[in-house]
């Protein structure tokens, strides 16, 4: 009874704090509250509080159940939210270099934890005895590595999606300006005097705004470079976790089912996801094709991760069906 009450309290504390943090980020984006001393730093400290709250929640379920809390979908979602809070700690303790991770990790943590604690999972499952298929020392190794890999890959993929959005906004007006120039050439014979006046006026405006335009383009370039850098770093880390998780799962499968690989739906999608991010890392080694191309591959991997993570859980089939919605 005490553990249930403590778990309930820690769940609400972590969710409330991360909700406040997300609100602070949203207000900062709207009204530029960075100028207020200490306001933005308090949001970072809020994620640290959330990290310890989720950590306490996981330890409470661990002590109460007697096994590592990764036996169902609810516990895996809480652990995934914990993984995002760990990634956020990187930006918190690395203040020398601004990396924009907090804009990705805070909304992701609140979305995942909100989904886990909502009524979409029917109810929050109580800690129970493991099913025979999960009673193994490989549970902590395999599932934790997979979830940590999912968290890092999702975060890196979201950074790549942000890179694509910023790049699209950068190149979009360029094509629009080219079309304007073409239309001006068509009408130049009829409105030469008017165009001459407009061009003279525009040249003055361009001289006045040249410094502002240069600083804005330079900031956008720096932002794209940072997003590309951190996307590569985090996806590389997630790829290592995913590889270790797949290999440990293969060893566990051989001990339980007598074969290393069975082409189970979860295994198949995990292999597809691993292949996509292997292609991403290969593209990053080629200076001629990296950039937007690698970001597109990472964005594709973002969808594949959710298919791999929730696909079997929605269908409730295969050897991994014990973590499905129906089992909760």
Curated annotation (Swiss-Prot):
Alphabetized GO MF terms: heme binding
Keyword Membrane found: yes
Biological processes per GO annotation: cytochrome complex assembly
Compartments, as annotated in UniProt: Plastid, Chloroplast thylakoid membrane
Positions of transmembrane segments: 13-33, 46-66, 73-93, 101-121, 146-166, 234-254, 263-283, 295-315
GO cellular component assignments: chloroplast thylakoid membrane; plasma membrane
NCBIfam families, A to Z: cytochr_II_ccsB (TIGR03144)
Protein name: Cytochrome c biogenesis protein CcsA
Species annotation: Arabis hirsuta (Hairy rock-cress)
Gene this chain is encoded by: ccsA
């Amino acid at each position: 009874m005490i553990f249930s009450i403590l778990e309930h309290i820690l769940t609400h504390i972590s969710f409330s704090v991360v909700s406040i943090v997300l609100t602070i980020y949203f207000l900062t984006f709207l009204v530029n509250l960075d100028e207020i001393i200490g306001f933005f730093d308090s949001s970072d400290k809020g994620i640290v509080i959330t990290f310890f709250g989720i950590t306490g929640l996981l330890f409470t379920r661990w002590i109460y159940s007697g096994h590592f809390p990764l036996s169902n979908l609810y516990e895996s979602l809480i652990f995934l939210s914990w993984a995002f809070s760990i990634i956020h700690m990187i930006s918190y303790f690395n203040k020398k270099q601004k990396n924009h991770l907090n804009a990705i990790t805070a909304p992701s943590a609140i979305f995942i934890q909100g989904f886990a604690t909502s009524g979409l999972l029917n109810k929050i499952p109580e800690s129970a005895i493991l099913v025979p298929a999960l009673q193994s020392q490989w549970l902590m190794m395999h599932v934790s590595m997979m979830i940590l890999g999912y968290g890092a890959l999702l975060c890196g993929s979201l950074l790549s999606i942000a890179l694509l959005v910023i790049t699209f906004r950068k190149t979009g007006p360029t094509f629009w300006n080219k079309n304007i120039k073409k239309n001006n050439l068509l009408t130049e014979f009829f409105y030469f005097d008017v165009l001459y006046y407009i061009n003279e006026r525009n040249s003055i405006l361009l001289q006045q705004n040249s410094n502002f335009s240069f600083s804005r383009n330079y900031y956008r370039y720096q932002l794209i470079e940072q997003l590309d850098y951190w996307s590569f770093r985090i996806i590389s880390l997630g790829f290592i976790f995913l590889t270790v998780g797949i290999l440990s799962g293969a060893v566990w499968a051989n001990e339980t089912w007598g074969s290393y690989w069975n082409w189970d739906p979860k295994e198949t999608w995990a292999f597809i996801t691993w292949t996509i991010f292997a292609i991403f890392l290969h593209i990053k080694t080629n200076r001629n094709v990296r950039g937007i191309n690698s970001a597109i591959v990472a964005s594709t991997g973002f969808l594949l991760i959710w298919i791999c993570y929730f696909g079997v859980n929605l269908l409730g089939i295969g050897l991994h069906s014990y973590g499905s919605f129906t089992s909760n």
